[in-house]
UniProtKB/Swiss-Prot annotation:
Physiological role: This protein is involved in the repair of mismatches in DNA. It is possible that it carries out the mismatch recognition step. This protein has a weak ATPase activity.
SMART domains noted in UniProt: MUTSac (SM00534), MUTSd (SM00533)
Gene this protein is translated from: mutS
This protein's name: DNA mismatch repair protein MutS
Chain sites annotated for binding ATP: 628-635
Length: 873
């Protein structure tokens, strides 16, 4: 809009349009009295997103003004909803004095909120991080730089286009920043809507200037990223974006980068156990396949007492380490927490941590100068509790936990400063006062003293005036509109002295002011204004003093968060009977009596199973070909194997009796699939894309889970693909592989490749009903029981009977064409050996060897037999 068009509007709307022109990509919250108002397109958008009323009031430039508003005291809840929907918001406050303003009160944008740069407690999810990420391209390499502003954590990484989706799935940014000229990668379609920034913000030289100025260095050699051109370009744009959005000065000038951003961490892809996007979804680490928060691995393990701990746990689950020194340190800590005084150590620490505030985010708000009084009182109370927690640790025999003592020690000067400066329960906001403690500042105490003497003065004046006038019901009072006044009923009007000057007339009374009361009013109200101004100045000075303690506060926050996670690990291990995994350099993956951590928590009794892969004695078990009925537990068995490996690489105990884990670099899963309608890909295309990624990237140290590959095409196409993929995994990738299939022909792999081993999930049939035993046994399955599963699903009996006839005919045709295939002949022989009238429990008991059972194994057998009886009754 040009100046001529703006001049046709009212002065207030001219001011609005001038400010809005600087923030066209944001919703402008424009402060008017007790409301934030939105106008025109912003009002229409906000009304739709927030379900608030859209109105029209008056007109400007001949057009009606569309507007919508929210109360300023309840704005946080509306702001939180908008940023969760991906909106950015500019907060425009009144910075001028209405009493002295000519025309519209002066206003400035003092705060900008974007989904990835949130720091306010009321806008953030307590147990998850908000991340802004920038992406740049240089000579075929993709540079990523991302920032968790609420924690002061900034990192960079260079990757390839093939791995971009996996990295974005891992980081899950709330905002993505791209150069204007960069073609949008198709992989970004499933993530937060990208924002385009000018190309110059991604310039390498500009980025180097930004970064070296922020960190006070001549170059970036100390951070190990001097050769990461693409990552540095992304980091420079990210810094510029954060600088422009952190507007905290009342003059509306761009803020500077906060002091808690004092280092840059370079992530190396080989530092973590890599998982692609499909694997993270299939393992249901933090979201179920339906997109829900529970039941997931995170929801099971997250009994953390602090938000810091919960966020770190989520980070660990998506960043499983390969550094065995760090992993062993975590495992030893969990072991000591469980073994040394469990009732008074990890339980005691967890109980104390429940009273610890979110030190990590409070520290960031101190650096940004946006910390509120309750933030500081929470920090003070937390620092006062830490010595008790440290003493609890120091007096325990848990040697591995003692490493947390030094970094958790609070600086006595910091604690003393907060204790002296703050009221025991400070006011919620500094503008209303009641924050700075009495005795902290002599001038503030004097101003408060003037206010404190108010009640005594009014009582004395009231008594004196009653005596002077002879009016017994005369009152001296105060209200915010008219200030101080003397109230006299109309019946006593003839007794009014000449020095009483009328201030207000009521129906049954008159209100007056006298020179003495007017002088006191001026002095008192002036003292209140001066006290509030003094308190605000002292609070800002306090924030400046606290900024000197940012680094030690960050160390405290990191230590509390890590110990909180390890206490949660210890509690889960103690409650569920987890064991300490053993890492070995041998190329093996051995899990005895393994369980699925989430599923076992939701069923009465879980059947544990073994996994043996790698160089086992003289045998090299590289691939387990898994057959058996639907619903028999194949997918659960595979997932529990991957989750056991994942947990071990997070430093957690695992749900098994024994776990020996050799070097593993990646986990791949090809389990289930659905159409990618947005990407224009069919189920089969999704399946093949995931399979291609595995075949291209899996190594001899990778764990690969493949479930029912080749279902989305014709039988022969699917079988051929499944066979070829399995052979490639065996001969080329040579990965640890669990390969579940309904193609029984694949069981012949064991004849061709000695490193392929057939196993199956067991089930028995009784009176046309199927009982799933959920136990893994050696050898191929005898049949799939597909018709039985269909019956359990509620398919009509008529359809089942018809399917049985068709199946019998197909089996007969297959046998007549291929007499060398003995799969169904074996079924016939087995059927004759076990008459249909024999109860499955009796059949099962015949196969049990009591002398070989451990006490725990015998108990498991009893539970299993009971389950079989319940299913066949």
């Amino acid at each position: 809009m040009n100046k001529a068009e703006q001049s046709s509007h009212t002065p207030m709307m001219q001011q609005y349009l001038r400010i809005k022109a600087q923030h066209t990509d944001k919703l402008l919250f424009y402060r008017m009295g007790d409301f934030y108002e939105l106008f025109y397109e912003d009002a229409e958008k906000a009304a739709k997103l927030l379900d608030i009323t859209l109105t029209q009031r008056g007109s400007s430039a001949g057009e009606p003004i569309k507007m919508a508003g929210v109360p300023f005291h309840a704005a946080d809840q509306y702001l939180a909803r908008l940023v969760r929907l991906g909106e950015s918001i500019a907060i425009c406050e009144q910075t001028g004095d209405p009493a002295t303003s000519k025309g519209p009160v002066e206003r400035q944008v003092i705060r900008i909120l974007t989904p990835g740069t949130l720091t306010d407690a009321g806008l953030l999810e307590e147990r998850s991080n908000s991340i802004v990420l920038a992406l740049a391209l240089h000579r075929g390499s993709i540079g990523l730089a991302w920032l968790n502003l609420a924690a002061g954590d900034m990192r960079v990484l260079e990757t390839s286009s093939d791995n971009l989706t996996s990295e974005l799935e891992r980081l899950h940014p709330a905002e993505i920043l791209l150069p204007e000229s960069l073609d949008l990668p198709a992989t970004l379609n499933n993530f937060a809507g990208p924002k385009r920034l000018p190309d110059w913000q991604f310039d390498y030289e500009h980025a180097m200037q930004q970064l070296t100025r922020q960190f006070g260095t001549r170059d970036l050699n100390a951070f190990g990223c001097e050769d990461l051109h693409a990552a540095i370009m992304a980091a420079g744009a990210l810094f510029e974006y954060v600088r422009l959005t952190q507007q905290t000065a009342t003059d509306g000038s761009s803020g500077q980068l906060p002091g808690h951003l004092h280092t840059l961490q370079v992530e190396r892809q080989d530092a973590y156990l890599r998982m692609d996007a499909a694997t993270r979804r299939n393992l249901e680490i933090t979201l179920t396949l339906r997109g829900e928060d529970a039941p997931t691995l995170s929801s099971l393990l997250d009994t953390c007492s602090t938000g810091m701990g919960s966020r770190l746990l989520r980070h660990w689950l998506h960043h499983p380490l390969r550094n065995r020194i760090t992993l062993q340190q975590r495992l030893d800590t969990v072991s000591d927490l469980i073994g040394a005084q469990p009732e008074t150590l990890y339980a005691g620490i967890r109980q104390q941590f429940k009273h610890i505030a979110d030190i990590e985010r409070i520290t960031s708000r101190i650096a940004l100068r946006t910390a509120r009084p309750r933030d500081l009182s929470g920090l003070r109370d937390s620092l006062m509790r830490l010595p008790g927690i440290i003493e609890l640790i120091a007096t325990s025999a848990a040697a591995a936990v003692h490493r947390f003592i030094p970094p958790m020690q609070p600086d006595p000067l910091l604690t003393q400063l907060l204790v002296r400066a703050l009221q025991p329960v400070p006011g919620a906001v500094i503008r209303e006062g009641g924050v700075i403690a009495d005795g902290f500042d002599a001038e503030l105490d004097e101003l408060r003293g003037l206010q404190g003497n108010c009640d005594e003065f009014l009582l004395q004046l009231e008594a004196r005036e009653r005596e002077r006038t002879g009016i017994p019901n005369l009152k001296v009072e105060y209200n915010r509109v008219h200030g101080f006044y003397i109230e006299v009923t109309r019946a006593q009007g003839e007794k009014i002295p000449p020095d009483y000057r009328r201030r207000q007339t009521l129906k049954n009374a008159e209100r007056y002011i006298i020179p003495e009361l007017q002088a006191f009013e001026h002095k008192t109200l002036s003292a209140r204004e001066q006290a509030l101004a003094r308190e605000k100045m002292l609070y800002e000075r306090l924030l400046e003093q606290l900024a000197d303690f940012i680094i030690p506060l960050q160390e405290i926050a990191r230590s509390v968060a890590e110990l909180d996670v390890l206490c949660a690990f210890a509690e889960r291990a103690a409650l569920s009977g987890y064991t300490k995994p053993v890492f070995t350099d041998d190329p093996v993956l051995i899990i005895e009596a393994g369980r699925h951590p989430v599923v076992e928590n939701q069923v009465e009794h879980y059947i544990a199973n073994d996994v043996q892969l790698g160089a086992i004695t003289r045998e090299n078990r590289q691939m387990l070909v898994i057959t058996g009925p639907n619903m028999g537990g194949k997918s659960t068995y595979m997932r529990q194997t991957a989750l056991t490996v994942l947990l071990a690489h997070c430093g957690s105990f695992v749900p098994a009796q024994i776990a020996r884990i050799g070097p593993i670099d990646q986990i791949f899963t090809r389990i289930g699939a659905a159409d990618d309608l947005a990407g224009g890909r069919s189920t089969f295309m999704v399946e093949m894309t995931e399979a291609a990624g595995i075949l291209r990237n899996a190594t001899a140290q990778s764990l690969v889970l493949v479930d029912e590959i080749g279902r989305g095409t014709s039988t022969f196409d699917g079988l051929a693909l499944a066979f070829a993929i399995a052979r490639h995994l065996l001969t080329q990738n040579q990965s640890y592989t669990l390969f579940a299939t309904h193609y029984f022909e694949l069981t012949r792999l064991a004849e061709e490749f000695p490193q392929a081993v057939n196993i199956h999930v067991t089930a028995v049939e009784h009176k046309r009903r199927i009982v799933f035993l959920h136990r893994i046994e050696e050898g191929p399955a005898s049949r799939s029981y597909g018709l039985h599963v269909a019956a359990l699903a509620g398919v009509p009996d008529r359809v089942i009977r018809n399917a049985a006839k068709i199946l019998a005919r197909l089996e007969q045709e297959t046998l007549s064409r291929s007499p060398q295939q003995t799969l169904f002949e074996t079924v016939e022989e087995n059927a004759k050996a076990v008459p249909a009238s024999v109860h499955p429990v009796l059949d099962y008991l015949e196969r049990i060897h009591p002398d070989e059972l451990t006490p725990r194994g015998a108990l498991e057998q009893l539970y299993l037999i009971k389950s079989m009886l319940n299913q066949t009754d």
